[in-house]
Structures are given as C-alpha cells and as structure tokens.
Amino acid sequence: MRKIKEISADTMTPISVYLRLKGKNKVILESIPRENDQSRFSIIALNPVKHIKFTDGILSVNDEIISDENPMEFLEKLVCQPESTDENLDLPFTSGAIGYAGFDTYGIFEGIQPELKDSIGTPDMYFMLYESALIFDHKREKLIFIEDNTYSQRSEKELQNALSANIESLSLLTEAENELTELSKLNFVSNMSQELFEEKVAKAKELIRNGDMFQVVLSQRLTADFTDNPFNYYRKLRVENPSSYMYFMEFDNFHVIGSSPERLVAVHGNQVSTNPIAGTRKRGQTEFEDQALIEDLESDPKEVAEHKMLVDLGRNDIGKISKYGSIEVPVFMKVEKYRYVMHITSEVTGELRPEFTAMDALRATLPAGTLSGAPKHRAYQRIYEFETQKRGIYGGAIGYLTKNGNCDFAIAIRTMVLKDKKAHVQAGAGIVYDSVPEHEYQETLNKAQGLLKVGQ
C-alpha cells in the first residue's frame, strides 16, 4: 500500500525542505549539473524502518545478528519485491535501501582480509531501509510525498498520518534556513608524508615494470578536527563544488557527505551502465588556460593509456552480467570540468542478462577499476600491502536500491566521513609504469581540494 501527495514546489528548495522535516536518519541525494544541463530529481528520505549493517563478517538488522547470510543477497531479498510495480510513477525512488558498500567489502567476498587497522570505525556496509520519501521533480516544479508500507505493514491510517505530518512540517520556517554560519578552518593532516607516498609510488612502478600488474591506485587519508554543523558543510559544498552525485547521509553515529563525479553502476530495468573517469588536470585560472590544459590532458600518452585501460576494465565488468553483443561505449574520452579539476570521462552500457540483478551488477563492478587498478584482483591485493589502514567507505559505492530492483550507485570519492568530531577525506592516484611520483602525490591533493577548501 502506498500514499502519495503532490504539491507545487516553485518556492521551495531541497535544502529548505530538508531543514523543516522532522525525523531520524534523514538523507538527501541530489544530482547537480556539471555544465549547463538540468538535473531533474532530488531525493529526501527519513525515518528508516530497518538498519542493515555488515562489519567484519557479521551481518545485523537493527543490531540483531543474522547468521550465514551473504549481505548483498540478504539486502536484495529484503528490499526487492518482484511483484511490486511503480507504474505511472516516473520517479527514481519510492521506497527501498539507501546507504553504502565500502571498498573493503570486495576483499571480504574474495577472501582478501589483511589485518589492517580500521581507524575510523564505520561498518563495511550500511544501508537504511526507507518507506518515507520526498521527491523533488525540478522539471515540473513539484514535490511528491510518498509513504509506503512494503516493509513495515503500516496501516492506511498510519501512512496517512505520516504523510500529513511531513506536509505540515513544511509550513514551519526554521531559523536554520537563514542561518548558514561560517565554517571553522579545517587543518588537515595526512596519514603519510609526501616522501613516504612517493616511495610507495616508486615501489608500485617497480612491480608494474616486472609484470605484476598494469596499474594500481594509491591513496592518502587526510584528517582534521570537526566541530561544525555537518549539514552546513554540505550546504556550502553543493554550492562551491557541485557534481553529478551529491549526498548527505545521517547514519546512527556518523555522517557521510559527498560530491562524487563518477557513477559506479546504475541499473534501470534491464539497462546497466558504468562511468569510468581517469585522467586529471587542475582547472585553469582563465578560459585560455583551461583549453591549454584540456589539450595537454588529451595528448598525454600516460593519461590516455590509463583511461583506455580502465574503459576496457569497465567493459569487462559490465560484460560479466550483460547479454553478449550488447556492450556499447556511447561516450568515450570526453573532458568534463568541475570546480577545481577536469577529468577524462567515458560511459559503458549493456543489457542485463535475465538471470542477473542490480546487486549482481554492484558485485561485478565494486570496487571500480579507477579506485583499484588492473587487473583488479591483483591491484586490490597490492593496495592492502601499500596502505596501512582499511579504506572503509572511500572507494566503495554510495547510492540506493529500489523495491522494484533498480539501483544507482556513485563511487565514494570526493567524500567526507564525519565521526567522533573528526573529518576524514581520502584521495588517490592511478600509478602506471611511467608515473612521476611527485605528480601523483599532487594529483591526490588536487582531487581532495573540492572538500578541503569548502567554506575556507
């Protein structure tokens, strides 16, 4: 059963609605234009009915341990309802799971579990199951309120009461809407020195030259004290560094804030797609400088070879679950500009085979080659030898799985994790045989700038 109410939203924004809503574990997912295109939907969800966590091999639902279950298969069985249909609803999400599967999830499934310190302390996988959602349709300037009982079996009266409460909350102006205070200066400290990072790059290059692998992504983590309002940080981030995937997620004891430019995988019906991004330059100060940097990027043999290799890896990942002959690359090596950097981007698509699902697509693509390397399995093993801490959420997948089996996941890059009054930002660089260590170190900092400079 579902209750839906649509109202005019021409005087509202996702931010004002989010601030007025009363509820727990609120999340907001937005897609902000990269250049001049118009993004259609923003998603807000609140009051999840279940918390699904997977930590160090232990699966739990609302903190009750579930034995002998593969967490992704369990999530799919819990969320997806084959008999459900969203006919006549041109909406990306009505109910389902929102959350993340971290980088280390792959290692758990593949038996690669080194004894590395987890210095942040977040679950390897954490999804919240939502029946209460609000969808902004920016094209039609409408706000759609949705209350569903797929997972909780709430009565019709309970659904109507919840719907009415959310609508009524929008009539109350909050002080927070007009009080966007200045952020404190964040003094980030890396988990390794520049010298140490460059030593690791040199060692990785030696392995590559010896034929151990073709590419590996090495990263550094930057940490700072954080005492500001997390949502104020998101409000500034979305203005100062807009991107394809914007998200603010309020978990039980931590927050995840991000502005990721890169799709890991999306499934809509039987169509599956991934969006490799590799090849980076900082933005120029002028249009002339920008164009010169674009030409330099497009003619750099190292960047071009790396990108082509990762497109091939994306084709291979999507090919595992797609019909033979259906793989296409509709976008190949297009340069896209962001606030602080520009990237070479491509898109790989396929037609999902009938025996596979959205979670199979996630398993096939996680982690992205752009965050691990090639061959993926070997590069993943080497990452754990080079890096001294579990990556956690960084490099994993952030997004949603709907009850009708669709999904959309971004790669967890340009992402900040806030926990225990600490802000954690991680960024990496793809190392190949002709990488220059100091250039790769600088690339990690360039990629992190969109988060490090917010409000500064």
Curated annotation (Swiss-Prot):
Binding site for chorismate: G279, T280, Y394, R414, G428, A429, G430
Catalytic EC class: lyase
Enzyme Commission code(s) on record: 4.1.3.27
Gene3D superfamilies the record matches: Anthranilate synthase
Pathway involvement of the protein, from the record: Amino-acid biosynthesis; L-tryptophan biosynthesis; L-tryptophan from chorismate: step 1/5
Record's cofactor remark: Binds 1 Mg(2+) ion per subunit.
Positions with a binding annotation for L-tryptophan: S31, S244, Y245, M246
NCBIfam families: trpE_most (TIGR00564)
Family per record: Belongs to the anthranilate synthase component I family.
Name of the featured protein: Anthranilate synthase component 1
Source organism phylogeny: Bacteria, Bacillati, Bacillota, Bacilli, Lactobacillales
